[in-house]
Amino acid sequence: MATINQLVRKPRQASTYKSASPALDKCPQRRGVCTRVYTSTPKKPNSALRKVAKVRLTNQEEVISYIGGEGHNLQEHSVVLIRGGRVKDLPGVRYHTVRGSLDAAGVAKRRQGRSKYGAKRPKS
């Protein structure tokens, strides 16, 4: 425990907040252009080819973004919307692409959890 004299000389430091998605600059989403679309392999216990894109954002930052859902139509120079949210088994991937907005099409034939993949309500 610090003495009163010590606290007068140097007050207690409030813990600083560190963003999990700093490239968004406190915005909910950001627009960007795909510079490279490729697949990446996950960390040790898992095995897959995860679809990711390197995106240059409007604030000139380059980030790696995960493309969720089955199949996608993204290629180089596609304009995408990026939201925060990391992928646990892909190191360095701290952002997700928003499906169903700008150039990223929604997932076709998606029945459940449609809002997360930009899929329209099916005609029943």
Swiss-Prot record:
The record's gene field reads rpsL
One annotated GO molecular function: tRNA binding
State the species of origin.
Xylella fastidiosa (strain Temecula1 / ATCC 700964)
Task: Report the PANTHER family cross-referenced here.
Answer: 30S RIBOSOMAL PROTEIN S12 FAMILY MEMBER (PTHR11652)
Protein name, entry field: Small ribosomal subunit protein uS12
Subunit arrangement? Part of the 30S ribosomal subunit. Contacts proteins S8 and S17. May interact with IF1 in the 30S initiation complex.
Which terms in the GO cellular component ontology are assigned? Answer: small ribosomal subunit
Family according to the record: Belongs to the universal ribosomal protein uS12 family.
Q: Name one Pfam family in it.
A: Ribosom_S12_S23
NCBIfam families in UniProt:
rpsL_bact
- What are the top taxonomic ranks of the organism? Bacteria, Pseudomonadati, Pseudomonadota, Gammaproteobacteria, Lysobacterales
Q: Kindly state which keywords UniProt assigns to this record, in alphabetical order.
A: Methylation, Ribonucleoprotein, Ribosomal protein, RNA-binding, rRNA-binding, tRNA-binding
Signal peptide position in this chain?
Answer: none
Give the stretches traversing the membrane: none
Q: Which parts of this chain are annotated as the region Disordered? A: 1-25
Function text = With S4 and S5 plays an important role in translational accuracy.
Any GO BP annotation: translation
